[in-house]
Amino acid sequence: MSHNTFGHLFRVTTWGESHGPAIGCVVDGCPPGIHFTQAEIQADLDRRRPGQSRFVTQRREPDEVKILSGVMQDGETLVTTGTPISMLIENVDQRSKDYGEIAERYRPGHADYTYDAKYGVRDYRGGGRSSARETATRVAAGALARKIVPGMVVRGALISMGEKEIDRANWDWDFLHDPENPFFTPDPKSVSEFADYLDGVRKAGSSVGAVIEIVAEGVPAGLGAPLYGKLDQDICANLMSINAVKGVEIGIGFQAARIHGEENADEMRSGNDGYPRFLSNNAGGILGGISTGQPIIARFAVKPTSSILTPRRSIDRKGAEVEVVTKGRHDPCVGIRAVPIGEAMVACAIADHYLRHRGQTGKG
């Protein structure tokens, strides 16, 4: 097992390294007859693309996707054929020379030591396979996953950065698409505060973490299976696989441990449409590992990147004690570009469970 594949029926295999000639993915299990355009895939990639503001890495990658297999032209759109869909993204702005000094040194907080401990060799150029560069391929796969579940909408937002938090009373999904919003924040009033805060962090050569919230609406009840195929289990696994993610919660998550049962349990009434009407959504749209039909809500915490200009104590491959300064082009807050990545990983998990549910029950 190489552990480069996730999903059961909607299976995604990614390949490539940060400073290799290209990265890509193969999506296997996508049903035939799904219509989409290459522009739709590209639009999601453009949201994750580096170099779009002073608040993210200045590496200039166009991230232009090439779809190599698994589709046919059908008028103005492409249609899936049911065979593996292969997508490729070329790397065009690598600067491997920036990493020469850390070829033999372990960067604190990075996967340098653990990759060496496991494989006995590591690609020091931009982190190789452990780089978030790989996540562009997940976003491409996620754009396809959005097409699998009819009526599903998956959106994400950055809700805190370091010690700064949004005001949820100002939440506006439409503001995410505003050209004056480089942070994927749903709170228009938070932009200037985030900008001033991150400018200070960036100029100090440091970094900061963030919390991202993902909301999936239009997900039917019944997806997921006990006990070892829970929907929230796979959502958490997908989100935890993203670089720098150190925690995931569903619904109110850890807050549930601080309240009483009568506060936590989502009460129900009969709805006018014949379906239950929940009076709250503390469970985040999942009970017993199975979707309730309410919006699925997940949050994940992203640590500050360890690629900073502050000298840090470490060792080299021979065990000698050294100081490490990480040069190159890095995000002062990797949480910003993690928003579309989180959306993609949640979309992939739900699409996979939708196909599994349809196969098991005949419902879809």
Swiss-Prot record:
Biological or metabolic pathway of the protein: Metabolic intermediate biosynthesis; chorismate biosynthesis; chorismate from D-erythrose 4-phosphate and phosphoenolpyruvate: step 7/7
Cofactor note: Reduced FMN (FMNH(2)).
Catalysis performed (reactions): 5-O-(1-carboxyvinyl)-3-phosphoshikimate = chorismate + phosphate
Protein EC: 4.2.3.5
GO cellular component, one term: cytosol
Group of enzyme by EC: lyase
Binding site for FMN: 129-131, 243-244, 288, 303-307, 329
InterPro entries in the record: Chorismate_synth, Chorismate_synth_AroC_sf, Chorismate_synthase_CS
Domain of life of the source: Bacteria
PANTHER family: CHORISMATE SYNTHASE (PTHR21085:SF0)
Database matches in NCBIfam families: aroC, PRK05382.1
Chain's role: This reaction introduces a second double bond into the aromatic ring system.
This protein's name: Chorismate synthase
